[in-house]
């Protein structure tokens, strides 16, 4: 009897328990046109995307899985998958601002490109999730983002009546005098697209086969937009419009889209 007792206790000690990610729906308006279904592993959001069509996004809260399990578009009464297995990716490059030699935050020529800087990849832990309604906007906030001295969350905002959605790393730091440059995009362990398309600065459309390789190719594009094309549809990616832009003597397309 004693031997079986100890064996049973040993088995309990090694029994794996799957971590569940809590989903907070307290600030979600269930009368919203955006419909939400949630479990410990998935959040499914369906919303009107204009012209009588519906869009659907499935988020995977499991730690080792891509965040965006699938993106779907309803056309002709049936769902078509645009892409699957996508992960938002952000790189933050931070450097020191010179707030002493001239006019504090009003300084214009502190030459940050010649000062020490470090690039961090934003890491996601998927600690918790919350869905909230703000008028015709619905925000999904996933806590547990970290990049160097920055901490925060990932926020996805859906817009009723549009296929547009915004993905943002909302982060802050207590470190003073920090300049920030960021890269943002979507990655996948497989190739979700058949082609990658863009318009050049003259407005001519281009597309190339999507291939898997170790290096990205920077191109000069119009509207800072690239398009992933699949059998089920296309997804256009572009950064949010500038809310503030410093005065420029010249303006150049530096081919920063990749």
What are these regions (language model features)?
Residues 57, 128-130, 153-158:
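Hydrophobic/aromatic beta-strand elements that line small-molecule binding cavities or substrate pockets
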């Amino acid at each position: 009897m004693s031997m079986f007792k100890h064996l049973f206790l040993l088995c309990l000690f090694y029994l794996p328990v799957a971590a569940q990610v809590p989903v907070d729906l307290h600030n979600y308006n269930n009368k919203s046109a955006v419909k939400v279904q949630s479990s410990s592993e998935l959040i499914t959001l369906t919303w009107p995307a204009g012209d009588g069509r519906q869009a659907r996004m499935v988020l995977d809260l499991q730690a080792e899985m891509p965040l965006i399990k699938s993106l779907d578009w309803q056309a002709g009464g049936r769902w078509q998958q645009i892409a699957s297995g996508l992960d938002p990716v952000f790189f933050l490059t931070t450097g020191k601002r010179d707030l002493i030699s001239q006019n504090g935050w009003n300084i214009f020529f502190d030459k940050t490109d010649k000062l020490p800087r470090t690039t961090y990849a934003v890491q996601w832990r998927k600690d918790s999730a919350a869905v909230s309604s703000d008028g015709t906007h619905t925000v999904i906030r996933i806590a547990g983002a970290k990049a160097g001295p920055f901490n925060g969350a990932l926020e996805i905002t859906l817009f009723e009546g549009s296929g547009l959605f915004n993905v943002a790393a909302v982060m802050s730091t207590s470190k003073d005098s920090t300049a920030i440059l960021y890269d943002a995009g979507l990655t996948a362990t497989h190739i979700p697209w058949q082609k990658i398309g863009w318009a050049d600065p003259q407005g001519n459309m281009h597309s190339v086969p999507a291939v898997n390789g170790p290096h990205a190719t920077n191109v000069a594009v119009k509207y800072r937009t690239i398009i992933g094309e699949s059998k089920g549809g296309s997804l256009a990616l572009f950064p949010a419009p500038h809310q503030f832009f410093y005065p420029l003597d010249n303006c150049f397309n530096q081919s920063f889209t990749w």
